[in-house]
Structures are given as structure tokens and as C-alpha cells.
Amino acid sequence: VDLKNERNKQKALDLGSLSKEWGLVYFFKDNCRFCHLQSPLIKKLSTDYGFEVIAVSLDGSVNEHFPESLPDNGIGALLTKGQGIQQVPALFMVNREQTKSFLVSSGVVALEDILSRIALLGTKEPGASLFGGESLKDTAYPSASNPLNQE
């Protein structure tokens, strides 16, 4: 139990530092029942971990968890390279310099999974090896060996 508590404290510290570099953009609609399930979890990212959350309504509605929500004024198209938001709820993370953005989740996703994705996306480039070294997409993966034991 102590090890788990220590790991949770470290995760909170890591996410707290990521919240200084990254913000979140949350897309929703009022008539979306999944959005009503996901919204309180997204709010926890703000209250518990310090992430700035910009809530964007695709239908102009106001969300009870995000009364300061904004209408979509093109940010959805910007984050999706012109495709627009196809499914809600959708959560993106955007770095403070606005040079990078990543889709964190689409649909209802557990808070623990969202936190893991934020931690991973905030510290690794997509396609980068989780074990250090070269990108997995550029390296033949030796199936007979354990990647954790490679030198």
C-alpha cells in the first residue's frame, strides 16, 4: 500500500509539472449523454492536477461543470488539421507555445487512462520507444527478447 501511495504522489507531481507546460481543450455537446459522464472527470483534471481546461461547445450550450465554456470558433478544425471534431466527448492536450497538440481521448474514458495518456504524450514523442533508444517505428522489434532487458 505504501508503494502504491508513493507512486500516486510521484504521478501527481509529474502531472503537476506537465500542467505547467500543457493545457487541455475539451469538446462536448449538450445532447451527448457520454459528455455528461465525461465532464466531471475532465473537471478533476483541473481541480486535482492543475490543468487549465478550455471547454468548447459544438452546439453553443453551456456545460454544468464548465459554465465558462466557449462556442467552437474554429479551434476544432485547427486541432484536427481541418477535419473538425467528429465525435464527442473529445479531449486534446496543447502545449503552451501552441506548437504541438495531441488527441488524448475520444468517447468516455476512465480518469486513470486519461492521466496515463497525458503522462505518456507529455513526455514522449508519438512513435518514440517507451524503453528509451530509437523509435519503435524505425526499429525491427526482436520478438524473442524482452525489450526491458535490452542494452
Language-model features: locations:
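N-terminal leader/targeting and pre-domain segments
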Residues: V1-S19, S116, G122-A128, G132-E134
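Solvent-exposed loop/turn segments at secondary-structure junctions
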Residues: K29-F34, D59-V62, T99
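Typically the conserved alpha-helix immediately C-terminal to a functionally engaged Cys/Sec
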Residues: F34-G50
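Short, internal strand/loop/helix patches
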Residues: P67-E97
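Non-catalytic, surface beta->alpha helical segment in thiol-disulfide oxidoreductase systems
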Residues: I85-Q86, M93-Q150
